[in-house]
Structures are given as structure tokens and as C-alpha cells.
Amino acid sequence: MPARKIGVLINPASAGGRAVKAWPEFESLLAAGDFEIVSYTTSSETDFRVHARAFAGRFDIIGICGGDSSLTIAAEELFSAGFDGELVFLPAGSVNDIVLDIREQRAPRASTLWLGEISAGATSKDFIGQANWGLGVAVNRQVGALLHSMPFLRPFTGIIGFLAIVFSHLLRRDLVSASIHLDSETLEGDYSIILATQIRHWASGLRFAPQADWYAPVFEVVTIRRCSLVKLIRILLAARTARHVDFPEVEVHQSRRVKVSLASAAAVQVDGDILRDVAGELKGLEYRLAK
């Protein structure tokens, strides 16, 4: 039987170079599986997108070596290019929540996944996992900036992330005042977290949306109303085992379409990356999500 051909895109920016270090092991596993491997290490997000589209026309099997954001960018480009082959994820990022869902949903299911779409003004993006406002954006921004300037601190990412949660809350950088319009109701208030997701895990392993399903045509919308720092930390700790839903500050809804209207312009994080447009980080007053 002839070897199957696979094209692999490697994102060297994932987790400060973790994908590059992990690739030799993945390459050995693929070679042992009798794959003929063509790999390419990208130089930028633009280069990654260009080669994802190019690979869509060259290969029936495409591998992505990187984190959640690498996978969702690839899915976006491959979907646009009409790719109907097999997508293989080789997880090597700082955030691998999508992998946790893949492992958890190993039971035979329909092969078609729903992609989410988020739009704000003229900017839109397809995604596999989730979009969130509030705490996740603030922590992403602080941790990313610190590790970019001091990459030697990467082994302490967990501690840095916890401190970022504390400072974000104390400085009110997590605060999002919003109206959330769902299929059948509208939620309003001050929130620390607004999450619209089709995967169960968030924030590097928290079981935040236990009923989310990317085979279903609806988002699971999870919100945490702003509360004390101690209560917020208790909620996040409880989310390890999905017990956060027992707190009155936490609400869970399902909706196929979601509109988030903000009192003041704010950024959104989509599958681990803050959404950007040609001018840089996008800050909108209204975001729409649909499947």
C-alpha cells in the first residue's frame, strides 16, 4: 500500500516555540504510521494563512502543529478554500482546550462540525471553539505582553496567569457591562466573564461549559456576574469539575445566535487570540455570533 501524503504546517510562534520543539516527535510518529510528510514552518500569521490555502489544493490530509489559535486559523482558511479532506491536529501550544474536547468526544459521532462565526462591523472570523469577553481578554493581554518581553518566565505561566487574574479584578479590567441577546431572552448586567462556546473546556482545562457540543447547532453561553475577588477565585476553582454552575453568579444558556452589546468598546478573545483587524486589536460595541 503506498504511503499516504500529509502536508503539515508548523507554527513556530505557538507557546514561545513549543511547536518547533515538539515537531520532531510528531514527525517520527507520522513516519511510523507510513505517511509521506511534507512540512512547512511558517514565518507569520499571514504566511500561515497563505500556506493553509495552498495546502488545501495540494493535500487530502493536512496537519497543524501548534495551539488552539493555530487550529482555528487553519480551519477558517481551509473552510474558505473548500477543503473537504482530513484535518489532523498536532497539539503543541500554550492553550490546548480543543484537544481536551477531541479526547473527550471520542465516541462515534457525525463527521460534520459546526463552525462559529463572530462579526463586529466589517470584521468577521470563523472559529472552532469559543469567544469570550472580560477576564480572559485582560489576562491574555497581560500574560502575553509579559512573556513577550521576558520569555524566560514562560515556565511560570501558571503563576503569572493567577496574578493577572488578581490584578485584572482589582483594577476592574475584567468588568464588562453588557446586554446579551439570545434566541429567546436578553441578559443584562456587569460581568467578569461572558463566554459563547461550542467546546466544554476553557482557560487551559477548566470544564467551563459541560454541555457544549460542536456537533450541535447552538452555542453554550456561560456568564459570571461581577463579584468579589474571593468569590471569583472560588468559582474558577470549582470550574475544574464543572461545579461552578452551582454559584448564583453563574448563568448557563443555549442559543444559536448571540448578540453582545457593550456599554463601552471592548476586545474579544477568540480561541486563545484577541481578535484584530487591519488597524490592530479590535474593540467593538456590538458583536454578533452565529453558527
Predicted feature descriptions by range:
Residues L9, Y40, S80-S192:
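Catalytic core of DAGKc-family lipid kinases
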Residues S14, G67-S70, E76, A92-V95, ...:
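Short glycine-rich anion-binding loops that position phosphate/pyrophosphate groups of nucleotides
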Residues L182-E188, F208, D213-K291:
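ATP/nucleoside-binding phosphotransfer catalytic cores, i.e., glycine-rich phosphate-binding loops
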Residues G136-V139, E188-D190, W202-G205, L229-L232:
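Short acidic/glycine-rich loop or secondary-structure boundary segments that cap or lie
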Residues A19, I73-E76, I98-D101, G205-L206, ...:
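Short glycine-/acidic-enriched loop or helix-start segments at secondary-structure transitions
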Residues M1-C65, T72, E77, A81:
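ATP/NTP phosphate-donor binding region
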Residues N132, G136, L195-A209, I274:
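Glycine-rich phosphate/pyrophosphate-binding beta-alpha loops
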